[in-house]
């Protein structure tokens, strides 16, 4: 199949984001991983944190590709202003899952499109409700290692899907890139 490359740089190494874009026949011209500081500033709420990280990923990529449009994104999980990033280890992943057990939480993705002085950021929140998890379910899930490199320690598109009682909002947002908003952002600049 002949894939038409679209005129933008995707500032993300996430295989999930690449796959989501490819699913709707969007193929970035360049894929670049921006290495930036993603530490949480104690004064930032989840939306400010996520927007800052997405924007900084785009700005870092603009340093390398100053003539290109840059698409970047950051996904976090939050509940009551507590931010859950990617767990550092299995123990932290277990803590996250215990916290989400039987509760609602939010998945937030900030998508940024940048070039020169143009910086547009879209924020998309999806509410996710987990069923109550027992110890065995958590241990079983942790043994899959699916929790690695996932905000909030789970992947809705994988084994953890059976834990999710309901979602309210964008499914693709929970995977890592809200496709409706991303498509419209790219389309607004004539990139697709």
Enumerate the predicted regions with their spans.
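Surface-exposed, flexible loop/turn segments at secondary-structure boundaries
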Residues: 16, 37, 119
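Anionic-ligand binding patches
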Residues: 2-8, 44-192
């Amino acid at each position: 199949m002949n894939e038409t490359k679209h005129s933008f740089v995707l500032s993300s190494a996430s295989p999930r984001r690449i796959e989501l874009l490819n699913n709707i026949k969007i193929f970035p011209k360049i894929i670049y991983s921006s290495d930036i500081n993603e530490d949480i500033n104690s004064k930032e709420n989840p939306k400010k944190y996520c927007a800052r990280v997405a924007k900084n990923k785009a700005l870092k990529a603009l340093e390398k590709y100053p003539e290109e449009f840059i698409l970047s994104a950051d996904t976090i999980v939050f509940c009551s202003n507590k931010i859950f990033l990617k767990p550092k280890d299995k123990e932290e992943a277990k803590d996250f899952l215990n916290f989400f057990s039987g509760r609602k939480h939010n998945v937030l993705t900030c998508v940024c499109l940048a070039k020169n002085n143009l910086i547009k950021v879209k924020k998309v929140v999806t509410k996710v409700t987990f069923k109550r998890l027992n110890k065995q379910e958590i241990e079983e899930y942790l043994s899959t290692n699916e929790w690695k490199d996932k905000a909030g320690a789970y992947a809705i598109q994988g084994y953890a899907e059976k834990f999710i009682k309901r979602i309210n909002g964008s499914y693709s947002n929970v995977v890592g890139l809200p496709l409706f908003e991303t498509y419209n952002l790219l389309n607004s600049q004539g990139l697709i």
